[in-house]
Amino acid sequence: NWEVIREEAMHLFDEGYIRAAEKNNDAGFGSFFKKGWKRFYLKWYDKPLPSAEALCPKTVELVSAIPNVKGAMFALLPGGSHLNPHRDPFAGSLRYHLGLSTPNSDACRIFVDGQEYAWRDGEDVMFDETYVHWVKNETEITRVILFCDIERPLSSRLMTRINRWVSAQLGRATAPQNLDDERVGGINQAYAWSKRFSDSFSGVVKQWKRRHPQLYRILRPVLAVVVLVVLWKWLFG
């Protein structure tokens, strides 16, 4: 079925649907967009996105038929780009990649805990994203893959239930969008607001920091605690 998935992915690519978050409302991958990384969400922890059901129904049907697939997207990385070392702090899932349109070259690869894997069309890999990993595309060709979060197998039913509950809460709070009329989770809304606030006041804050460095060091952690409390009440209160 990978050719069917690739056909729908490349149609979205050609039409410009695989793109960065235009409103800075994707907290999980905000730093990736600076590197030219782009995505189109298929499913995010509770159900498929309406835009995905309309634009790539065959892939959505395939992904939805596998209960352990919690999140799925098409992910793009342009030639000559890279993603810095990072890791997922929540160990509730494993990461799955299926090569769709790749350079088919060892120069386009991912490093997971020091081990290399180069993507190839039609070939897949699964890894533990809690290990530090990073990506290099040292070719001139854009890489497009199917990117999935797979529920992590755990040793007991209790741990599995806890994992599913936590994943469901995080999934709702981080709900993404492909199109403007789709719902955005609270964490992503807060991230977008913080980006707008930061962009608006960064110059003023930098000037104030230079003039009052000691007071800035005192107030910064206090402000961070206040923001966390407000965010917690907004999301869970």
PLM region spans:
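C-terminal, beta-strand-rich globular interaction domains
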Residues: D128-E129, I150, T160-N163
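A short hydrophobic beta-strand segment most commonly corresponding to one strand
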Residues: R95-L98, M126, I141-S156
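A short beta-strand-loop-beta hairpin characteristic of the jelly-roll/cupin
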Residues: L100-D121
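Short beta-strand His + acidic residue motifs that chelate non-heme Fe in jelly-roll/DSBH
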Residues: L83-H86, C108-I110, F127, H133-T139
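A short, compositionally biased micro-patch
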Residues: L77, S101-P103, D128-T130, E138
